[in-house]
């Protein structure tokens, strides 16, 4: 990953790098890999995340249809 530093503005370059890393999911992956996760725990976590995503999508869909 590469970020260009313009006009010696390191703070802006760091913000851009952090945003790119966040978008790529690097921080989330690092947090998950700090400790070993048993395969059964991983499946349970992924299933819970999928359920959460589905609920959020359904809620958004209902809200959109309710607005019409």
Swiss-Prot record:
GO terms for biological process: translation. GO terms for molecular function: structural constituent of ribosome. Keywords: Ribonucleoprotein, Ribosomal protein. Gene3D superfamilies: Ribosomal protein S8. GO terms for cellular component: ribonucleoprotein complex; ribosome. Belongs to the bacterial ribosomal protein bS21 family. NCBIfam families: S21p. This is Small ribosomal subunit protein bS21.
């Amino acid at each position: 990953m590469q970020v260009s530093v313009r006009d010696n503005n390191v703070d802006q370059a760091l913000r851009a790098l952090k945003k790119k890393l966040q978008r790529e999911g690097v921080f989330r992956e690092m947090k998950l890999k700090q400790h070993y996760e048993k395969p059964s725990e991983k499946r349970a976590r992924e299933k819970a995340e999928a359920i959460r995503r589905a609920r959020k999508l359904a809620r958004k869909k209902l809200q959109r249809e309710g607005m019409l």
